[in-house]
Amino acid sequence: VRLSEQLKPYKLKWIEDALISESIDQYEILRKRIPEQTLATGEQWYGVHPFFHAASRGIVDILQPDITWVGGLSAIIKIAHIAESAGIDVILHGGGGSVYGQHASYGLTGISMIECSGPVITPIGVPLEEKDRFPGTPIPKDGTIIPSDAPGFGLEIKKEWFPDFFS
């Protein structure tokens, strides 16, 4: 709360993950203490229920599910519908780093931005186009990313990667 007050002159767009993920009920207290500050969280929540809980109680402004941790594309669709019905925005945690997150962000209403980062093992300063990524995964250019329209979400999976499966 004190940090939020000290940062007011900088007009932060939002404060992200202000509390540990297990503290969902504490967000209700935080919301009452700093009602004017946009709050975002959810990247370490699992399944749909925490998002429903947060949206139905109006304790955050931006839900940030991680597509790999909440249960995949089906869960993201449910969360997007929950958020839309509550008037809450969704920004997928690391959504720009996977083709599934890219397609969900591009195709679902209520998702206004995409968070994009490269693999954590890639050295700082390496251009995005040179970072390790799954073949067929689009990369951002000039602040924009367009998901592939190729079959299979655009992933380029080669049979030689799975010799036992295709033998």
Explain the meaning of each model-derived region.
Residues 5, 11, 19-144, 148:
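Shared catalytic-loop signature of beta/alpha-barrel
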Residues 8, 39, 155-159:
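Generic detection of intrinsically disordered/low-complexity segments and helix-coil linkers/edges
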Residues 151-167:
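Extended hydrophobic packing segments that form well-structured cores
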